[in-house]
Curated annotation (Swiss-Prot):
Location in the cell: Endoplasmic reticulum membrane
InterPro entries named in the record: MFS_dom, MFS_sugar_transport-like, MFS_trans_sf, Phos_permease, Sugar_transporter_CS
Region ranges (Disordered): 261-280, 290-312
GO biological process: monoatomic anion transport; phosphate ion transmembrane transport
Official protein name in the record: Putative inorganic phosphate transporter C1683.01
Pfam families attached to this UniProt entry: Sugar_tr (PF00083)
TM annotation in the entry: 48-68, 100-120, 124-144, 154-174, 194-214, 230-250, 348-368, 397-417, 422-442, 451-471, 487-507, 510-530
Purpose of the protein: High-affinity transporter for external inorganic phosphate.
Source domain of life: Eukaryota
Homology family: Belongs to the major facilitator superfamily. Sugar transporter (TC 2.A.1.1) family.
Disulfide bonds: none
Alphabetical UniProt keywords: Endoplasmic reticulum, Membrane, Phosphate transport, Transmembrane, Transmembrane helix, Transport
Species this protein is from: Schizosaccharomyces pombe (strain 972 / ATCC 24843)
Amino acid sequence: MKLNIFKSHGDSNTAEERPVPLEQVEAEDQQHENRFWLGLTAKEFRLMMLAGVGFFLDSYDLFIINLVTPIFEYLYWGGIEKGPNGKGHYPSGIRGLVNAASNIGNIFGQLMFGFMGDFFGRKFVYGKEMIIVIIATILLIAMPKSIHSPLSKMMWVFCWRWLLGVGIGGDYPMSAAITSERSKLNRRGTLISLIFAFQGFGTLAGAIVTIILLGCFEHPLNREGHYRKLEGVWRLQFGLALVPAIGVLIPRLMMEETQKFKNSQQLNSGDNRDPKTSLNFEDDELVKNPSVTKGHPEIHESSENYLSRSNTVENEPENIEKQFESVSAPANRSGFIQYFRQWHHFKHLLGTSVCWFLLDIAFYGVNLNQSVILKNIGFSSGTNEYRTLMKNAIGNLIIAVAGYVPGYWFNVFLVEILGRKWIQLQGFVITGLMFAILAGRWNEISTGGRFACFVIAQLFSNFGPNSTTFIYPAEVFPARVRGTAHGISAALGKCGAILASLLFNFLTSIIGYGNVMWIFCGCMWGGILFTLLLPETKGRDADEIDRVELFYGGDGKVECNSKWKSWYVNGIF
């Protein structure tokens, strides 16, 4: 099926009009807009702060447990040294369950809020997840002192961190969908990356807050040995997240519905006419007779390939654009199933979901147990409890500053240059290589060498699949299924995180840290294979592709002149 659409350039009275790439049109429009920070407009900056603060909280709340775990060990389980039976005082099964609590809640939140966002709308849902985060945090830090059993205390923490995870999980599909739908095509990847990069600041803040709080309690902890004061430390660690959460709550609740979502709901009013017959193209010469030239260059290629190419995507004339707005399908269960019944759509969901799953096995396996890993490689030892906790926090801070945060910002500045697919592939390759080095030489590499490998792995994980697995579902799926598809992808990723949380300590005690690194390496290289299913989404407008497919009955077959371009840009199979 061929489609001839164009954006005229120049005087309408001229005999010849040239197609103009959409990115060029958007760039010209942006020249007339006031720039703010990092080239963002005021609206983009406000969107970045509202959605970005959510991911700041996501990272802070999800990873602060890594720094709280040693405190729980000292307070409730008699320290972190091994007992006479050779096992730690803090049972590994309970520790894994508490660490995984937020990730378990994430799955419910991502699926529930993703579906509700597509069914009820972004405006109806956005902000509700932050209410859950606030309530869960308050209840978490309000653990009564009347609970004496360490196991009961951990169950209290588990329950409210699970609810916290529901709210945090809901932020993933909603912030991704809203940002994608409010962004201009040539800056969409940068803006989504900026918002996701706030995760780095959240992790960094967690380490800094811990160091400051330990410093404030230095006298009673270090000099007097009053370690019960750690009760105040962990409650403040969790509780300080309330400040930004409350700050963005009202603006989120007041945010307007996105225009792209409104357009995707045109057929949801009960008028289920055939998209072909519901449009009126009788007066459009280009549609009646695609071979008509009239001075316009013809574009003889498939609609999906045409619209997906970042350097040739073009805007249709205004009358066609308005007609395409009515070619959408309602966001409901049958529409979702119908969309993903087609292999060329389902393979994208398979690619985004499995890549996220494999990534999170290694990513959360390292990050949720970073304090344990630092202790094992000899970095977090100290002469007393206070110095051990402080050195552990400093080790986490160094990893965040050296690898975690820079990785996000490399992605911000290069995502629109290198493209999503290349960044994801190189991230999987290099991170897998670091895990392979650690696995093969775990007992031979020095403490500094192991530490450097973890830093490099963090750098290329965040400048790679940790960022792009979030970007891909926001860009590759149209608005009518975007929230649900993003929620499914993220939820499967969290399944990998849960596996890592629950099995890491068990596996390291059975097969050792080196062999666990081999498992992480295999996950990274498995991600390479599933990345090949995905198209390059740089400059790709999934909503326009969806409208074209609906208009032509969903038979938009990809055609490319170059075999390399075909499998790389559009994905294999």
